[in-house]
Amino acid sequence: PKRVRAFAGRFAAAGFKGSAFLPSYGMAESTLAITFHPCGTDMVVDRVDASAMKKGLATLAAPGANADDPSVLELMSCGVPFPGHELRIVSETGDVLPERTVGQVLTRGPSVTPGYFENEDATREALVDGWLHTGDLGYVADGNLYICGRLKDLIIIRGANHYPQDIEWSIGELPGVRRGNVFAFSVDVDGQEALVIAAEANRGDAAELREQIKRRVSEEFGLVPAHIAIVPLGELPKTSSGKAQRRKPEQLYEAGELPQHDAE
């Protein structure tokens, strides 16, 4: 939300209106869009307590709390469901969750696919009683959908939920780090989940940058990374369309093949 507001403010002099932004949520299995922000209306931002979110609860932040305060998390609404479509948020056991509780997003409606071509196993896994299991985590508040991340990407350390995108975005703001080319994921260390960071950066003082990343992650998320890999520019894998291949850095790390400027 901060970047969107900054963009709208910068180009307001040229006649740009913030209401031109149309946040939405969708996927190919639903013939793209599932929810859409009403045209011509200002975007809706939810300000929640960051600590509560670690427990899966989108509790409203204290009134008057500064948006830049680490205890406050802002999420942009992805809009409301299209007519004839339904949303449901469920727990790991499939129980329907109340508003402001984070769970897996399910949807059903006339645009949802009946299944995957010649892949019955994938169809059975994704579609149950007509409900498409999206694999995305989110919550609903006042009819609006808020997306938090991917279920399979969720990092759970000491019982607290951490969304890798939040960690990656924060690290990406550090000088020298290539924004959008940061990956946070968890690995098993002696039976416990541990955090690993891989970040592309310009060649320089990798040791100092690791310390900056360690401080940032500790101060904002209360976590201590087990390993921080400073990777040369262009080494972290992406798809042909520029999307992050989130599984690849984890696989490279586990195989000991993640290229680095220098070893720790």
Across the structure, where does each feature detected by a protein language model lie?
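Conserved C-terminal "lid"/linker of ANL adenylate-forming enzymes
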Residues: 181-185, 196-197, 214-264
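Residue-level signal for well-ordered, solvent-exposed loop/turn and beta-edge residues enriched
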Residues: 88, 95, 144-146, 160, ...
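Extended hydrophobic secondary-structure segments that form protein cores and membrane-embedded regions
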Residues: 21-25, 105, 197-199, 228-231
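AMP-binding/adenylate-forming catalytic core of the ANL superfamily
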Residues: 109, 114-115, 120, 125, ...
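Conserved AMP-binding/adenylate-forming
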Residues: 2-144, 152-154
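A short beta-turn/loop motif at secondary-structure boundaries
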Residues: 26, 187-191, 234
